[in-house]
Structures are given as structure tokens and as C-alpha cells.
Amino acid sequence: MVLSAADKTNVKGVFSKIGGHAEEYGAETLERMFIAYPQTKTYFPHFDLSHGSAQIKAHGKKVAAALVEAVNHIDDIAGALSKLSDLHAQKLRVDPVNFKFLGHCFLVVVAIHHPAALTPEVHASLDKFLCAVGAVLTAKYR
């Protein structure tokens, strides 16, 4: 998925508003995904999936860090997330549809916390970005 210059500007703008809340939003995204799409819990059988658990917060921090890394390298998302792509494809074997679920839940979290920032244009750009991240994370699946 090709991001236009406007898309890149919009995505960077949203992430500048997220700022120091990225880890919190990552955990909130996971909690929302586990509730809205309970089948995603199967990849985390060893986690305490209760609200506010340390494990969800820690994994939310990883999710947020990956998204920030992708934003910081928006012109080379594949290069920035190559190791993460290998991990998900070869070791974790996460069903690719789950990245769409995660992206949707992240959009909802952004909309809740920054409704004014999520104009239709920004929404479209952020959706394209999250789809691009998902495509990178599933590119090495066979």
C-alpha cells in the first residue's frame, strides 16, 4: 500500500498528538481487541487478560513501540519491521486477519482520545498506514 505525502503528514500528525500516551493506547487497543474479537485471545494463553494487567500493559508497550517505529520509518516500514515480520510469520504464526482487528481497535482508541484530530482524511490516512503495517507483518507468510 502506497502512502501519499498527505497520508504521511496525517499519520505523523496523529502520532504527535498521541505522544506520551502510546503505551497506554497500545494496552487499551489490546484490551479492546480481546473483547471485540475474543478469538484473538488464543495467541496469549499465558497472559492475564484482565483489565490493566501487567502483561497486557507490557505487550501494549511493544505494539505501541512497533507502530512508532513504523511512523519513524514511514518511507521504509518493511525495513523497520522486518524482524517483527519474521517473528510473527515464522515463530508466532498469527493469523493475518488479527492485524486488521488490531488496526481497527487502534483507530477506535485514537477516535476516543482525539476525536477532533480524526477527520475523514486523517482517518483514511491512518487506516492506510495500519493496513500497510499489517501487510508488512504478513509479507513473509507462506
From Swiss-Prot:
Task: Give the highest taxon in the source lineage.
Answer: Eukaryota
Query: Which is one GO molecular function term here?
Result: organic acid binding
Quote the record's binding site residues for heme b.
H88
- What keywords tag this UniProt record? Heme, Iron, Metal-binding, Oxygen transport, Transport
List the GO biological process terms: hydrogen peroxide catabolic process
Q: Which residues form the Globin domain?
A: 2-142
- Membrane-spanning residues: none
The SS bond pairs are none
| Any one cellular-component term (Gene Ontology) | blood microparticle
Q: Where does O2 bind?
A: H59
Q: In which tissues is it expressed?
A: Red blood cells.
Q: Family assignment?
A: Belongs to the globin family.
What is the recorded function of this protein according to its Swiss-Prot or TrEMBL entry?
Answer: Involved in oxygen transport from the lung to the various peripheral tissues.
Tell me how this protein assembles. Answer: Heterotetramer of two alpha chains and two beta chains.
This chain belongs to the protein called Hemoglobin subunit alpha-A
This protein's species is Mareca penelope
| Gene assigned in the entry | HBAA
